[in-house]
């Protein structure tokens, strides 16, 4: 109940209580508040016992905390039958990122070696950096123009517009 109250907030509440009720009435107010909280807890516990008795022995393991959606979902997802813990343990983000990094570095090495063999030194420089500026590609066929052919256009979908 009071898990999310910090030290500064607690001190603020105490100072505010002293200012509002005064040092003379404060002990009486604290006793009244604790007595009220105790009665509310007793009423809640007796209501839970009455509900459990009326539900019968089938619901002996019923927990009222499960009615809270967060705890219900947490309890259901931590169930071993689903195997979610195995999936979480098998998912290693650092390992996957290292694999992706290695794959990218492997492609950079391949492109720099193939770029230097084909005579294109602008693809990768000697220090391992890639030239990111756009440069027009040389046409493969001497008769090919800069305009894309009708086959190169993306398909047009009437339903998408």
Swiss-Prot record:
<dbReference type="Pfam" id="PF02416">
    <property type="entry name" value="TatA_B_E"/>
</dbReference>
<comment type="similarity">
    <text>Belongs to the TatB family.</text>
</comment>
<comment type="subunit">
    <text>The Tat system comprises two distinct complexes: a TatABC complex, containing multiple copies of TatA, TatB and TatC subunits, and a separate TatA complex, containing only TatA subunits. Substrates initially bind to the TatABC complex, which probably triggers association of the separate TatA complex to form the active translocon.</text>
</comment>
<dbReference type="InterPro" id="IPR018448">
    <property type="entry name" value="TatB"/>
</dbReference>
<feature type="compositionally biased region" description="Basic and acidic residues">
    <location>
        <begin position="131"/>
        <end position="161"/>
    </location>
</feature>
<dbReference type="GO" id="GO:0043953">
    <property type="term" value="P:protein transport by the Tat complex"/>
</dbReference>
<dbReference type="GO" id="GO:0033281">
    <property type="term" value="C:TAT protein transport complex"/>
</dbReference>
<keyword id="KW-1133">Transmembrane helix</keyword>
<dbReference type="InterPro" id="IPR003369">
    <property type="entry name" value="TatA/B/E"/>
</dbReference>
<keyword id="KW-0653">Protein transport</keyword>
<keyword id="KW-0813">Transport</keyword>
<feature type="compositionally biased region" description="Low complexity">
    <location>
        <begin position="111"/>
        <end position="126"/>
    </location>
</feature>
<keyword id="KW-1003">Cell membrane</keyword>
<keyword id="KW-0812">Transmembrane</keyword>
<dbReference type="GO" id="GO:0008320">
    <property type="term" value="F:protein transmembrane transporter activity"/>
</dbReference>
<keyword id="KW-0472">Membrane</keyword>
<feature type="transmembrane region" description="Helical">
    <location>
        <begin position="2"/>
        <end position="22"/>
    </location>
</feature>
<protein>
    <recommendedName>
        <fullName>Sec-independent protein translocase protein TatB</fullName>
    </recommendedName>
</protein>
<keyword id="KW-0811">Translocation</keyword>
<comment type="function">
    <text>Part of the twin-arginine translocation (Tat) system that transports large folded proteins containing a characteristic twin-arginine motif in their signal peptide across membranes. Together with TatC, TatB is part of a receptor directly interacting with Tat signal peptides. TatB may form an oligomeric binding site that transiently accommodates folded Tat precursor proteins before their translocation.</text>
</comment>
<feature type="region of interest" description="Disordered">
    <location>
        <begin position="102"/>
        <end position="161"/>
    </location>
</feature>
């Amino acid at each position: 109940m009071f898990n999310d109250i910090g030290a500064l907030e607690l001190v603020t509440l105490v100072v505010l209580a002293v200012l509002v009720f005064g040092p003379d009435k404060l002990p009486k107010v604290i006793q009244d508040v604790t007595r009220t909280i105790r009665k509310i807890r007793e009423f809640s516990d007796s209501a839970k016992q009455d509900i459990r008795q009326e539900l019968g022995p089938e619901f002996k393991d019923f927990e009222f905390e499960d009615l809270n959606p967060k705890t219900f979902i947490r309890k259901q997802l931590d169930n071993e039958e689903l195997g979610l813990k195995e999936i979480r343990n098998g998912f290693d983000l650092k390992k996957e990122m290292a694999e992706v990094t290695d794959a990218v570095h492997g492609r950079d090495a391949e492109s720099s070696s193939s770029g230097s063999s084909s005579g294109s030194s602008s693809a990768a420089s000697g220090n391992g950096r890639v030239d990111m500026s756009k440069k027009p590609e040389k046409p493969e066929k001497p008769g090919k123009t800069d305009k894309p052919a009708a086959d190169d256009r993306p398909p047009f979908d009437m339903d998408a517009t």
